[in-house]
Amino acid sequence: MRAAVLEDGRFRVREHPDPVPGPGQALVETAACGICGSDLSAVAHTDEFLRASRDSGTTSFLFDPDRPLVMGHEFSGRVLSYGPGATGPEPGTGVVGLPWAVDPGGVVRTVGYSNAFPGGFGERIVVQAQALLPVPPSLDLGLAALTEPLAVGFGNIARSAAGKDTPAVVVGCGPVGLGAVAALLERGAGPVVASDPSPLRRAAAARLGAHAVVDPAAQDPVRLCAELAGARPRPTVVVNCVGVPGMLNRLLHTVPRGTEILQIGGVMTEDVIRPVVGIYKDVTIRMCLTYPPEQFGATLARLAEGRIDPASLVTGEAGFGGLDAAFASLRRPEEHIKVLIRPGQGGTGVTARRAPADDMPR
């Protein structure tokens, strides 16, 4: 199969061995695959990324950087076939799936972060058959690839204390942060303040219905949320979706007493916090990786029912040959929100899908 293979920090488009579904597994033809923030970290900070996996004792993000790797875990596609004993949606059915597979030794691997299980930056993927969900006909198959990143936002808000009239702040409005904004609004939280330096991303948060959007260089989002919530400080849910060293400590110092901080952004290096500040303020910190499995299906349903417009979040598309350009562009968040990789698209650049909104907050 054709694939964009990561070698020495660059993507090279070439032939790669076809994955073969084992017992309980499915073979899927890739329709589209999103580029995740963790993909950017894995390429730019490979040693730290792998060290964190080893130090945490997880096998989900371990790969050999000296061997070819086909990344991409935010995928959608069509079922081609099944391995022994596997059943699921009929071949030809459009699907999305939780990106996991079990290797012959019984170890769970993440598709796209395993040398043995190539991801959606290749033409075909092998995943566990039970991880697949059919895409409803009301949802474009390519746009269904946004199910995974949005599920991270929805799933972690579902685990939080956020409810009706809970003041909330979302720091970082990439796809995960925007999923968190939508999830908070769905639960009746408010005021919901979204913070991002990028006007493009602030505009997306505003379109979703955030009560206020701010540039953190100009205004502190936590203080603004407190002002909007009223004179008496109230416990707040703060969702930190940026992997910026020092941000967690900064939030500890500014949030109201009793706040819950969801740390979703992955800081690749060691960081420093002053725990006693959080202790004195009775702050809860929840480190967040992914989502309860049922939230994946619930997020797919939200997209299919039109409760979120995935097309408004996709700002660019590229083929395998455009991956280097797409990664470079996503490191400049003022340019894009989500870039989808489409196997059939040619060229070496990123094609813009959506112009910045005229009513973009400045």
PLM feature segments, named:
Residues 19-33, 48-101, 136-138:
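Glycine-rich beta-strand-centered segment in the early N-terminal region that forms part
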Residues 22, 90-93, 128, 163, ...:
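Residue-level recognition of short, solvent-exposed, well-ordered loop/turn junctions
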Residues 41-49, 356, 360-361:
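Short Gly/aromatic-enriched secondary-structure transition segments
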Residues 61-68, 73, 97-171:
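NAD(P)H dinucleotide-binding glycine-rich loop of Rossmann-like/cofactor-binding domains
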Residues 139-218:
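Mid-domain Rossmann-like dinucleotide-binding core that forms the NAD(H)/NADP(H) cofactor-binding site
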Residues 160-164, 207-284, 361:
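Glycine-rich cofactor phosphate-binding loops and adjacent beta1-alpha1 units
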Residues 198, 267, 291:
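Residues in the short beta-alpha loop(s) of Rossmann-like NAD(P)-binding domains
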Residues 249-252, 293-362:
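C-terminal hydrophobic helical "lid"/dimerization subdomain
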